Amino acid sequence: MDDQALVQVKVWDGWVRLVHWGIVLLLGLSWLSAEEGWIDLHILSGCTVLTLVLFRIAWGFLGSETARFRHFLRSPLAALRHLAHFSRPEPDHGVGHTAAGGWMVLVMLALLLVQPLTGLFSAEEPEFSYGARGPLADLVSPETCAWLTGLHAANFNLILLAAGLHILAVLAYRLVKRHDLVRPMLRGWKWLPAGMASPRFGSPWLATALLALAALAVYGVTRLG
């Protein structure tokens, strides 16, 4: 830690944290409900994930500074440079995602978007997974349905792999660089030098409207089946 005076600075809004921790809980619920055959709960959980992901994508363009893609998406070369210098000790004065972390966010959002979208069109045989059927499974051919069902299962394994890499990265930051990435994502603020400006935050009214629109869109799509 520096000799500079440190103050509490808000770096993450409640909306980003809602999406982050909400998806953590919902992934566990989705897995458990699939294993136990709680099909209605599984569909509800997947639709909620889709709602949060759609909202997060919109918030990535219209939301708070640290939530915006243009704030944290840098070139792949910048991400590689960041990883190459990972072992160098440095104070934890970053605001928002790192160059490498930004790409992980993009990968996770893509995987989390594919998962519920394929689930909408998926259907298992009655002897497997309690005969689960997505609300739109009848809108596609049996061949397409079978392909999307396989993709739905395979993509979940990719999500687990990406989540595992994310957890390992968080641990590496803690052990190697002494950077705590968890507490700021829990409470929204971190200790930063007094001279650093706080990032700009988006309108809560806009966020509420975007979240409501995402929920309505998902609900409308599920009623098409």
Identify the role of each PLM range:
Residues 1-225:
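Membrane-embedded alpha-helical bundles that constitute the cytochrome b-like, heme-associated redox core
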